Regions:
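Intrinsically disordered, low-complexity regulatory segments
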Residues: 1-487
Length: 487
C-alpha cells in the first residue's frame, strides 16, 4: 500500500503532501507562498493542483478528521508512557482514536487508504479477518490444508513448506519459468536465470500483481522504476506455449529413473552387513534408469516410427508439433479455442497442415522459416526497417582483416563498404544474411509490415501508409512507424 504520514500539533492534523491527495476534498484554502490560492476550500484536488502544490514547495496541508475517512493505521499506535496499544495495525482511523493520540501526546502516525490504492481493500480485509498472527501458526495451517489427515507439528510443517518452494531437489523454477516471470514483472529478461528457487521478493511481486489486476490495466511504473504491463493472459498465445523437445522429455524420465535407483541404493545400504568391504557393484543397480529410458522410447505416447517413405516425408515428420502426450492435452478434453488458428501462429505454425478428425488443431507443423529457441519458444524471422528504409543485416562469419568480430550483426551496406576500403593483400570479412528472429511476445512490442510492401532500389518504402500489424491486430501505419518487415 501507499503510505501517508499525518502530523499532529496543537490538536490539529497536517497531511504530508503525497499523490494520495489527488481526488480528495480540502477543508480549507490551500495557499502558496506568494499568497495565491491553489485550491479553494471544499474543492477536489486534481492532478494539476497537486503539481502546483509541489511546485510551490507545499509539504503539508491542514486537514480535518472527516478528510481521513477510509484511512487505516499502518502499525500499532502505542502510548509510550504506559505501553497501552491505542489502536492496532490495520484498524480504521476514527475521531476517538485521534482524540486518544492527542491525549497521549503522540505527534505523528502512518496511514493508508485501501479503497483508493490500486491494490484494493482485499489485502487489508484479509489480514483483519485472519485469526493467525504468527509465522509458526501460518505454517501449521498450511500443513493442515495440504495434508488434511495428518496431525500437524511445527517441524513437519516447516519441512513441507521448505520442500515446496525452497529445496532445489524438490522444486525447480526452471530457466524458462524465470524468463517468463522476469518478463511479466518488468525485470531484465536474463536476470537470475540459473536460480531454481523463489525469493521473498518474487512472492511479493506475484501477490502485488494479482491484487492490482482488478483495478489496473495497461502499463504502470513501480516504485523501483520497473514498467509492468497488467493484462489477462491468453493461454493460446504462443508466448505462453512452448515446445518441449525430446531431450527435455527424456531428461524428466531419466530423473525418475535416478530417483528410483537412489531409493534402491539406500535400501541396500541399510540392510548390507559388510559396508566396510562393500563394492559399488554390490549396491548399485542401473536397471531402474535403463528401464525408464527404454520405457520412454518404447511405449511413450509420443514415440513413433519415423516416416521414411522419402526424404521429404522424413523432414516433415521431424518438424511435426503435438499438443498431446504426457503433460499435454487429450483429444476428448481439448476445446475449440486450443485447436483454432491464433494470430501468433503467423510465421511460426502452418495454419493449413493439420490432420482431419479428432486430432485437428492438436497436431501441426512448423512454418518454413520458423525455429525453436533455447527456451522452447517458436521464433519467426524479420527484416529491420529504420526510418522507413529496409536495411538487410549480415552476420560476420570470418572477420578477416576488418575490425569486426565473429558473430557481429552489421548492415550489409556497411560490411560491403568496409571490405571495399581494405587495401591490397588484405583479407575481406565473410558473412551470411542475418534475419532478426523474434518470439511471439517480442513481436507484440513492434509494428511489423507485410513482406509485399513496395520498396525502391535503395530499400525506401514507397507508400506513405502501409499495411502492418501490431500485437496481432492489422493496422495502417506510416512508413516511419514500421520497425520490422516479414521475410
Amino acid at each position: 500500500y501507499t503510505v501517508d504520514k499525518i502530523r499532529i500539533a496543537d490538536a490539529n492534523l497536517y497531511w504530508q503532501v503525497s499523490s494520495s491527495l489527488v481526488g480528495s476534498r480540502t477543508s480549507a484554502d490551500i495557499v502558496g507562498k506568494n499568497g495565491e490560492v491553489i485550491v479553494k476550500s471544499g474543492k477536489k484536488i486534481g492532478q494539476s493542483a497537486y503539481d502546483s502544490m509541489i511546485a510551490a514547495g507545499i509539504t503539508e496541508i491542514s486537514v480535518k478528521i472527516e478528510d481521513l475517512t477510509g484511512a487505516y493505521t499502518l502499525g500499532d499506535l502505542v502510548n509510550t508512557s504506559d505501553g497501552e496499544v491505542i489502536a492496532e495495525s490495520n484498524t480504521e482511523l476514527t475521531a476517538e482514536t485521534i482524540a486518544k493520540l492527542i491525549e497521549a501526546g503522540i505527534g505523528s502516525l502512518e496511514i493508508f487508504f485501501p479503497d483508493k490504492d490500486d491494490v484494493g481493500s482485499t489485502m487489508s480485509a484479509t489480514v483483519r479477518k485472519d485469526a493467525i498472527k504468527s509465522s509458526q501458526e501460518a505454517l501449521i495451517e498450511i500443513y493442515r490444508k495440504m495434508r488434511p489427515g495428518d496431525p500437524p507439528t511445527l517441524d513437519t510443517s516447516q519441512s513441507l513448506f521448505h520442500g515446496m518452494f525452497f529445496d532445489a531437489r524438490k522444486f525447480d523454477f526452471s530457466r524458462v519459468g524465470r524468463l517468463k516471470f522476469n518478463i511479466k514483472m518488468g525485470r531484465p529478461e536474463r536476470d537470475r536465470l540459473e536460480d531454481p528457487l523463489l525469493s521473498p521478493l518474487d512472492f511479493f511481486d506475484v501477490i502485488d500483481y494479482v491484487l492490482k489486476m482488478k483495478r489496473v490495466t495497461g502499463e504502470q511504473k513501480t516504485r523501483d522504476g520497473r514498467t509492468i504491463f497488467y493484462s489477462d493472459d491468453d493461454i493460446d498465445h504462443l508466448g505462453n506455449r512452448r515446445v518441449r523437445a525430446v531431450g527435455e522429455l527424456l531428461e524428466n524420465q531419466f530423473r525418475l529413473g535416478l530417483v528410483r535407483m537412489e531409493r534402491a541404493i539406500k535400501e541396500k545400504m541399510s540392510i548390507h552387513t559388510e559396508m566396510q568391504t562393500a563394492m559399488p557393484r554390490d549396491l548399485i543397480n542401473a536397471k531402474p534408469v535403463t528401464a525408464a529410458v527404454r520405457e520412454f522410447f518404447g511405449s511413450s505416447q509420443l514415440s513413433q516410427f519415423m516416416d521414411q517413405t522419402n526424404p521429404l516425408s522424413e523432414i516433415t515428420h521431424k518438424r511435426r508439433l503435438s499438443a498431446l502426450g504426457p503433460g499435454g492435452l487429450s483429444r476428448e478434453r481439448a476445446g475449440f479455442e486450443v485447436r483454432d488458428v491464433h494470430t501468433t501462429h503467423y510465421g511460426r505454425i502452418c495454419p493449413i497442415e493439420t490432420p482431419e478428425g479428432p486430432n485437428i488443431g492438436l497436431i501441426s507443423s512448423l512454418s518454413c522459416f520458423a525455429r525453436i529457441n533455447e527456451f522452447g519458444f517458436i521464433e519467426s524471422p524479420y527484416r529491420k526497417v529504420v526510418d522507413g528504409r529496409l536495411i538487410d543485416y549480415v552476420k560476420i562469419i570470418n572477420p578477416g582483416d576488418t575490425q569486426y568480430k565473429p558473430g557481429d550483426h552489421v548492415p550489409e551496406e556497411e560490411a560491403a563498404q568496409v571490405n571495399k576500403q581494405l587495401g591490397e593483400g588484405k583479407k575481406p570479412a565473410t558473412h551470411e544474411p542475418y534475419p532478426f528472429y523474434q518470439s511471439a511476445w517480442e513481436e507484440d512490442k513492434y509494428i511489423i509490415g507485410q513482406a509485399n510492401i513496395e520498396v525502391d532500389a535503395n530499400g525506401r518504402i514507397i507508400g506513405e501508409r502501409v499495411n502492418a500489424r501490431q500485437a496481432g491486430e492489422f493496422i495502417l501505419a506510416t512508413r516511419d512507424e514500421v520497425q520490422f518487415m516479414d521475410v
